[in-house]
A protein has these predicted regions:
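Sec/Tat signal peptide C-region and signal peptidase I cleavage site
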Residues: 3-10
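Short, hydrophobic/aromatic-rich segments at coil-to-beta transitions
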Residues: 11-16, 81-88, 109-112
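K/E-rich alpha-helical interaction surfaces of small helical-bundle regulatory domains
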Residues: 12-26, 124-132
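Central antiparallel beta-sheet cores of small beta-barrel/beta-sandwich binding domains
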Residues: 21-92, 98-99
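Short polar/acidic secondary-structure junctions
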Residues: 22-24, 93, 104, 118-119
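Generic beta-strand structural signal
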Residues: 35, 80, 105-106, 130
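Short aromatic-glycine motifs in intrinsically disordered, low-complexity regions
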Residues: 60-66, 112-119
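Edge beta-strand at a domain terminus
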Residues: 108-110, 117-132
Length: 132
């Protein structure tokens, strides 16, 4: 019984993930991915640079405008589609833009997060690592 739970959990995107800066490759934040109503969502639960702990999403629009990045939901409403999650959005707090998004596991401890405009070929992929 416990083995099946561990196996299922090991292959799930649900959990805590460390994000990295595209340019510097430094660890940036911890995002916790949860599932609600069959869709996944990701919230920033920790900002790793002490100087940036209090930053706000100045360039965001709507309900996210001027909200603290800490606690901000950046992955929004992705649905499972085979081995990946898609049909949702990712918010880039640095520029306030929402992008279409796909998320897929690469092994148990790496998560490929792709944000794009229009078609997936015009985008970029980040690799997040599982926090244990």
């Amino acid at each position: 019984f416990f083995i099946s739970i561990l196996t299922a959990n090991a292959q799930s995107v649900v959990g805590k993930w460390k994000t990295f800066d595209d340019e510097t490759k430094e660890a940036k934040s911890i995002v916790e991915i949860t599932e609600r109503g069959g869709k996944i969502y990701g919230k920033v639960i920790e900002i790793l640079n002490p100087a940036k702990k209090d930053i706000k999403c100045k360039n965001c629009s709507g309900a996210d405008k001027d909200k603290p990045v800490l606690g901000l939901e950046i992955l929004k409403g992705l649905s499972k589609d085979g081995k990946e999650y898609s049909d949702g959005k990712i918010l880039d707090p640095s520029n306030g833009k929402l992008y279409k998004c796909t998320v897929s596991l690469d092994g148990n401890d790496k998560l490929k997060v792709r944000g794009y405009v229009g078609i997936s070929a015009f985008g970029r992929t980040q690799v997040w690592t599982r926090v244990k």
